[in-house]
Every structure is written in structure tokens, then in C-alpha cells.
Amino acid sequence: MQTIIRVEKLAKTFNQHQALHAVDLNIHHSEMVALLGPSGSGKSTLLRHLSGLITGDKSAGSHIELLGRTVQREGRLARDIRKSRANTGYIFQQFNLVNRLSVLENVLIGALGSTPFWRTCFSWFTGEQKQRALQALTRVGMVHFAHQRVSTLSGGQQQRVAIARALMQQAKVILADEPIASLDPESARIVMDTLRDINQNDGITVVVTLHQVDYALRYCERIVALRQGHVFYDGSSQLFDNERFDHLYRSINRIEENAKAA
């Protein structure tokens, strides 16, 4: 099975607090993987390293590779990092859209990497690009909002626009950081349904950080759980049972309660 993301000996320290401890991880083509863990476990930190949004510690042997290209090595970004990022779609909890632009214009931003620079200066997109953007919006059920300002949309609708932008980008990997954290249950279901549809029908690798264990079990075949910066569990979601859940979450809660009591 083709390895899409490879992480070796990744460590990260913030202000003398070690957030990640020598993490090793391989993610394969067409997988949909949930990163789970309590707050502060390192799951979002790990996700942001995968495309070089942040760099790890300068640890000997640390290395991240995406789609066969080095993203970072021993705390330094690769010189051709833009090529890796061009193949990666991002979906963040805070949506990361341009509020003053229309839905269609936000989706067209996904084509900037494949558009001549002089065209991007004037937002001159081809008819073919606009058609692809509309097709992407149709795919996520948002084409009727194409000419509406993105600032008028609900949180769930904005997340679907972000997914359409990743489709427009023709991303081979989608990294989603808490995409349903602030959404109501129905909007969360629609967003996760959309991500799973893209994963299953397009073969796009999806890595998503989640707080909601039930969504991870329902939508992702594989779970990677982090606990205090270490990989606690890496395997089938079907084998992530109540005992593992208890060790992952409740033991952390007991540690925090004991610390407060002290």
C-alpha cells in the first residue's frame, strides 16, 4: 500500500513543554484517519506539522514526508515546500475563508497555485476554472449559494465551502483540524458525510482531528490516539473499545483532578 504521509521521530517543544515525543506515523493512500486525544494531547500540533505550517524540534533523524516529498527534516522546512502544500487541502475550525468574497470566489482561490501569476493579480480566472468551481460547489451541496457573500453563511456551510476549495485545488490529501468542533449535530453530520464521500469516491487521503469519539468511530476506519504527546493507540476503529477510551480520556481527567486537589 502506497505511503502518502510518513513521520519519523517528530518532537515538538513549546516553552519547555514537550508537546510531541518522537512520534512515528505512516498514513496510506485512500485512508481516512482520525486523530483523537484529550485537549493538549498534541493532535492538532501533529496535524500542522504534516504540511509544514509549523516545524518540529531540531532532533536528529526527525523527518516528515508527504506524497514522496520531504516537508521538513530536523526542524527545517524543505526548499520546495510549496509543491507539497499545493497538493494539500486545509480545513480549519475557524474556516479560513475570505469573508468579503463570494462563495464562488473563495472556491476559485483553490486554483491560484495552477494559475499564472499575472492572472491572479486581477482575479482573472478562465471559464473552465469557474465551471470546475461550480462543480465543486455542486458536489458539496452549496452551488445555490455561489454568488452569496461567505460571511452570511452558517458555520457548517462555510466548512463545506472550504471542502469545495480543496476539490478545486485538486488536493491529493485533505488535513482537517477540528472541522466540526463548533457545529450543531446536523451540520457536523453533513460535513463528515462530505469528507467521507470524497475519501471513498475520489480516493483522497483524509486526516481529521476530532474531539468527538463517536464521529471518529462512525466515519474513520483507522484511529491514531495521542496522549500527552505520545501515540497511545494506532489501529482499527473497530478495536478502539471502552477500555482504551477509559485509558485515553478518564485517566487524564483523574490526573488533572488530583493536580487541582493538591
From Swiss-Prot:
Signal peptide positions are none
Q: Name one Pfam family in it.
A: ABC_tran
Any one GO molecular-function label of the UniProt entry: ABC-type phosphonate transporter activity
- ABC transporter domain spans which residues? 5-253
| Assigned EC number | 7.3.2.2
Look up the domain of life of the source.
Bacteria
User: Among the entry's GO cellular component annotations, what is one?
Assistant: plasma membrane
Keyword tags:
ATP-binding, Cell inner membrane, Cell membrane, Membrane, Nucleotide-binding, Phosphonate transport, Translocase, Transport
Q: Does the keyword Cell membrane apply?
A: yes
At the top of the EC hierarchy, this enzyme's class is translocase
The family assignment reads: Belongs to the ABC transporter superfamily. Phosphonates importer (TC 3.A.1.9.1) family.
Official protein name in the record = Phosphonates import ATP-binding protein PhnC
Q: What is the lineage of its organism?
A: Bacteria, Pseudomonadati, Pseudomonadota, Gammaproteobacteria, Enterobacterales
Gene designation per UniProt: phnC
